[in-house]
Amino acid sequence: MIEAVALARELLRIPSVSRDERAICDFIEERLQGDGELSLARFENNLVARIPGSGPRVLLAGHLDTVPGEDRVFEDGEVLGGLGAVDMKAGVAAMCEVATRDLARDLTLVWYSCEEIDASENGLRRLAGAMPGLLNVDLAVVLEPSGGAVELGCQGTLRAKVELRGRRAHSARPWMGRNAISRAASLVDRVDRLEPRRPILGGVEFKESLSAVRIESFVANNVIPDSARIWCNYRFAPDLSPEEAAARLLDWLQPVLEEGDTVTVEDAVAGAPATMSGFEGLVAAAGSVRAKLGWTDAGFLATHGVPAVNFGPGDPLLAHSPGEVVAKAEIAGCVEALASWLAS
């Protein structure tokens, strides 16, 4: 049987930045091939394992890739550290141990590539297209880091570009123009003052947020600019559709918009509904439950009618940071909680 903590230590030594997951996928495939209970299938740098069983069919999903960063592995007493320790090699290792446990449930496990980059390259989506029936499951758990709590659903996310108009002039005579950067400051202030909704959905509280994440404006060092572009990211609760979220964003920004300004939604995806139905045993084993603040592939699974939660080892606040560390006890605890639920 695979031991998750030892495997996580080995996985941390295998670089797997997005689009470079072949080596880690090969490694996991080789480790799992010796288990006679598993039926393995490989597509590109994505791996699927099937374990037949009874009861509801369950999918466990975890991505193999990491963001770029310093490739340094370290161990300090009861923690493991390194690029991807939290997001999400600890979860990937936990999946591997669960795959070799004696369980009662009908189980599908998916290790997939390119989650950290554009959705068009996401390995879970590519697998769903290449393997019809893969998502014909009753329940799913995405092993994103959750600090050992079960996180229900996920937020939707929307990215919009706002272009504000001004009037160009010489910077020695700024009163002859209208500075689009000054207008942008007013818009950013409006963005920062959005009162976040906090709806209770599925018994847990979601907190929305709106942030300015990028700004551009420049003509020359002696010119008052006549346009400014601000990109906003709206994280909305899963009771809103992307269309409803876009309408709410536009309504909020309207007081600082003028004729000629434009708001363009460049990307928007729905969240996943918060539901505990079917996951009660996992929540009991984990000991805590809350809302998922952020978007995960639980949202993608929801578009295919699959109820999904997030549950994995590691503090999500450390994801993508130089100090990613995960407690060994948390990895083991994740395995035991999943195994307890899946064996029931």
What are the roles of these predicted feature ranges?
Residues 43-45, 62-64, 113-114, 139, ...:
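Fold-independent oxyanion-binding glycine-rich loops
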Residues 93-159, 202:
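Acidic/histidine-rich catalytic neighborhood of metal-dependent amide-processing enzymes
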Residues 64-76, 137, 152-163, 309:
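Acidic-glycine-rich active-site phosphate/pyrophosphate-binding loop
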Residues 145-146, 152-153, 159-344:
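Metal-dependent amide/peptide-bond hydrolase catalytic core
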Residues 39-40, 47, 58, 107, ...:
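Hydrophobic anchor at the start of a short beta-strand
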Residues 1-85:
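Acidic/His- and Gly-rich active-site-bordering loop/insert found
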Residues 57-111, 119, 123:
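Active-site metal-coordination/substrate-binding segment of hydrolases
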